[in-house]
Each structure stands twice: as C-alpha cells, then as structure tokens.
C-alpha cells in the first residue's frame, strides 16, 4: 500500500508534501514501512476515516487523490474470488461509502486545485455514475478528463480515473 503516493512524492523531488490517509491502522503501518524503505522524506501516513472532515485541511490541497474502496471488479484476473463474493447489495453499499467519502474530501481542494477520483473497478455505478452524482452536487468542480480502462485494453488490471478541477469561485 502507498505505492502511488510514494511515486508522487518522489516525482515532487521535495518541492511538495504528500499526506496519505487510510482508515486501517495496519495499512498505515505498511505505508510507513514503504516510506522508510523508499527513503521518501516529503510524505507522511496517517490513520484517518475519510468520512470525517479534517477542518484544518479545508481548502489547502493542490491535489486530492480519492483512491476509494471499491468492488475490485477490474482486478478479477488477480482475485477471481471477487466475482463469487461480490453481491449487488455490496456494490450499492460501496457506492454509498464512495459518495460519503467524496462529500468530505472534496473540501480539501483549494480553488484551482484538482481532485483525482480512482477505483480498480469497471462498474459504471462506482465510476461514471459517481462522477455524474458528484458533479450534480458540486457545481464548483468541472471534469477535465475521465477514462475507464478495461483489463483487455492494456493487458493490465481494469481501473477508472477522473480528473476534476475546482474552479476559482
């Protein structure tokens, strides 16, 4: 865990700071170990429930990466058991959780900043429909790009990514 964040921290070459958060204390400990192993000095990991607003972070982030919990339907090659475990009601619960998290973390983006929404699923409800829901409820954002990658397209896992920009209002 933390691989994308570590990569971003390295690309910043010390010119910025990366704060990565996860609700799981165990995952945070793994991220901290990876930070040490990669000798990244401009990154910290914190245990935090993304549904809970951090008042001190509102309007301060140039970029928020919302890499949200999802059904994982884009990684069936690696985890084929998902198709047997995942039920329609599970996906509905995940969509509700994703929306709750988005409703909180978007506040951290400063005007002119960006929010990256990503999942490792190919489910439209968790992807395009969530972005449409978010845009209908947060007019201060605009979609800059949105892409669904299917597993057979690049020979990789399936995933979704949308880049949203907070307008200067």
Question: Residue locations for each model-derived region?
Answer:
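S-adenosylmethionine
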Residues: 1-169
């Amino acid at each position: 865990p933390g691989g994308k964040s570590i990569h971003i921290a390295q690309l910043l070459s010390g010119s910025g700071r990366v704060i990565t958060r996860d609700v799981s204390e165990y995952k945070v400990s793994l991220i901290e170990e990876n930070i040490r192993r990669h000798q990244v000095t401009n990154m910290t990991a914190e245990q935090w429930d993304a549904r809970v607003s951090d008042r001190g972070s509102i309007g301060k982030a140039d970029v928020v990466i919302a890499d949200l919990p999802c059904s994982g339907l884009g990684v069936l090659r690696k985890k084929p058991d998902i198709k047997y475990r995942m039920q329609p009601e599970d996906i509905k619960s995940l969509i509700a959780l994703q929306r709750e998290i988005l409703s909180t973390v978007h506040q951290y983006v400063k005007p002119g900043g960006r929010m990256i929404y990503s999942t490792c699923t190919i489910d439209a409800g968790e992807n395009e429909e969530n972005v449409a829901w978010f845009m209908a409820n947060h007019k201060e954002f605009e979609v800059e790009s949105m892409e669904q990658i299917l597993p057979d397209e690049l020979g990789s896992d399936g995933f979704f990514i949308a880049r949203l920009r907070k307008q200067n209002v």
